[in-house]
Amino acid sequence: MSMIAAFYGGKSILITGATGFMGKVLMEKLFRTSPDLKVVYILVRPKQGQTLQQRVFQILDSKLFEKVKEVCPNVHEKIRAISADLNQNDFAISKEDMKELLSHTNIIFHCAATVRFDDHLRHAVQLNVTATQQLLLMASQMPKLEAFIHISTAFSNCNLKHIDEVVYPCPVEPKKIIDSMEWLDDAIIDEITPKLIGDWPNTYTYTKALGEVVVQQEGGNLNIAIIRPSIMGATWQEPFPGWVDNLNGPSGLIIAAGKGFLRSIRATPMAVADLIPADTVVNLTLAVGWYTAVHRPKSTLVYHCTSGNLNPCNWGKMGLQVLATFEKIPFERAFRRPNADFTTNNITTHYWNAVSHRAPAIIYDFYLRLTGRKPRMTKLMNRLLRTLSMLEYFVNRSWEWSTYNTEMLMSELSPEDQRVFNFDVRQLNWLEYIENYVLGVKKYLLKEDMAGIPEAKQHLKRLRNIHYLFNTALFLIAWRLLIARSQVARNVWFFIVSFCYKFLSYFRASSTLNV
C-alpha cells in the first residue's frame, strides 16, 4: 500500500491554478491514487455565462480524466469550485466560502501564477507575489492545515550559473515592491522595470524570486516547502504519454516548427534543454506534500525538479528528434515543410528571419489579398518572432541545479511509493518521450486525427516540389539578369556551355569507337 496515497485519503485539499496545465495533472493524479480523499477546493475565476459547476464539468470533460472516472465515479461531487479572483483583495471570496476554506483545508498546493515572460510588472507582482502573500495569510488562519506547497520555477534565480536548493535574497525587499505597485502609475513602472529586474531576463522570473522570499519571510510557523520545476512539458507516463493542453514551453515551438512557420531559431545546440514532464513534477509535488506534513522539517525545504544534472539532453539533439518525428507523424495543412535550423549570432539570425520568416509571410499575405481574403500571416509571424526573442535567453544557456533535497526525498520513499509516485528523471528515455510529445501535441492540442497522416504526408510532398520549383525558377531568373548585366557572367556561362558540349561530343565519339 502506498503511504503517500493513503496520506491523502480523507483530506481536504486547496489547489490554486487548478484550471492550468499542472493543476489539472495534479488533480487527476490525486483522484486516481487517492479516490477516498474528502474534497478538492479549486479557486475559479468567474466567467460570464458559466456557472461554477459547469466549469468543473468542463475541466473533467477531457481525456485526461478518463481513468479517474473509472476509479472515482463521483469525482465531480468531490471538486468544490469557489469563485475567486487572485487580482482582488482576499481573492474576492465570499464570507461563507472563506469560512469553509479556513475551517476544513488540510493541504494547500499553490500552483497559480502568471507565466507570461512579457507581463507588465504590476500584474506579475500581483499574481506571483501579492497573491502568494495573501494566501499565506489565509493559511495562517487554518487550524487544520498540515502543509503549504508553493510551486515556483527553477529559473527564479536564472541570474546565477549554479543554483542551490535555498531561497536567495532579492536586491529589493518584496514588501517595498508590493507597496510601490499600489501607488506608481504604469508609465513610471515601465520606466523603472529594467532597473528593478536587473540581471533577471523578464518580469516572470523576477517576481517568482520575490514570491519565494515572501514564502520564507511570511510563512511563520507553517509547514512550507518550495518546488522549482524547470521547463514543464507533456506527460511522460501518467495517465498516458504525451498529454498536453497549452502552448507554453516547447509545445508552441513544436507546433510552429511542425506547421513550417519556424525555420530558424537563435539557440546554442549544445546548451542543455532542461525539460521536465508534467507528471514528474506532480509526483514530486505530492511526495513533498506528504513529507512536509508528516516529517515537519524545521526549515523551508526547496526541491529542484530538473533533468539537466541527472539526465541531460541538449537542444540540438532534441531538435533533430522533433524533426525526425515530423517525418513519421506530420501535422496537417502545413504552411511549409518542417526544417528548423539553429543560428548562433545576430547577423545570421536577422538574415534568416528576413528570408525564411518575414519574406514568405509577406508573399503569402499578398496572395491572400489577390484572392480577396484577409491577410494574417505577417501578423502571426511577427508574434512568433517576438516569442523567439523572449526565449533566446533560455535556449542559449545551461544551468547547474543541485538536487540534494530531491534525492533525499526519493531515498525516504518506500519501493511502492517510488513506483506509484515516480519522479526519477534518470529513467526517462528522451527519444521516446519527444516522439510521444509531438504525437500528443498533434492529438490533444491540434485535435488532428491519426487517419489524416497519409494526406498530411502527400501535402508535404507537394510543398517539397513547390520548394524545388520555386528555387530553380529563382536561380534561373537571377542568373539571366546577371548574364544580361555582366560580361564576366556571360563569359562564365559560355565557357560552361562550351565545356559541356565538348564533353558530350567526346563521350559520343568514344562510344562510337568502342562499337
Curated annotation (Swiss-Prot):
The residues on the Peroxisomal side of the membrane are 485-515
Q: Which reaction does it catalyse?
A: a long-chain fatty acyl-CoA + 2 NADPH + 2 H(+) = a long-chain primary fatty alcohol + 2 NADP(+) + CoA; hexadecanoyl-CoA + 2 NADPH + 2 H(+) = hexadecan-1-ol + 2 NADP(+) + CoA; octadecanoyl-CoA + 2 NADPH + 2 H(+) = octadecan-1-ol + 2 NADP(+) + CoA; a very long-chain fatty acyl-CoA + 2 NADPH + 2 H(+) = a very long-chain primary fatty alcohol + 2 NADP(+) + CoA
Q: What is its main location?
A: membrane
A Gene Ontology biological process in which this protein takes part is: long-chain fatty-acyl-CoA metabolic process
Q: Which GO terms describe its cellular component?
A: peroxisomal membrane; peroxisome
Sorted UniProt keywords: Lipid biosynthesis, Lipid metabolism, Membrane, NADP, Oxidoreductase, Peroxisome, Transmembrane, Transmembrane helix
The record's section on InterPro entries has: FAR, FAR_C, Far_NAD-bd, NAD(P)-bd_dom_sf
| Entry coiled-coil feature ranges | none
Q: What EC number(s) does this enzyme carry?
A: 1.2.1.84
UniProt cross-references to Gene3D superfamilies, sorted A to Z: NAD(P)-binding Rossmann-like Domain
What membrane topology term does the record carry?
Answer: Single-pass membrane protein
Transmembrane segments annotated in the record for this chain: 466-484
Kindly indicate whether the keyword Transmembrane helix belongs to this entry.
yes
Cytoplasmic side, ranges:
1-465
Q: Name one GO molecular function term.
A: alcohol-forming very long-chain fatty acyl-CoA reductase activity
**SUPFAM superfamilies in UniProt:** NAD(P)-binding Rossmann-fold domains
**Subcellular location, record wording:** Peroxisome membrane
Q: What does this protein do?
A: Catalyzes the reduction of saturated but not unsaturated C16 or C18 fatty acyl-CoA to fatty alcohols (FAls). A lower activity can be observed with shorter fatty acyl-CoA substrates. Can produce very long-chain and ultra long-chain FAls, regardless of whether they have a straight or branched chain. Involved in the production of ether lipids/plasmalogens and wax monoesters whose synthesis requires FAls as substrates.
Family statement: Belongs to the fatty acyl-CoA reductase family.
**What's the protein called, per UniProt?**
Fatty acyl-CoA reductase 2
Name its species: Bos taurus
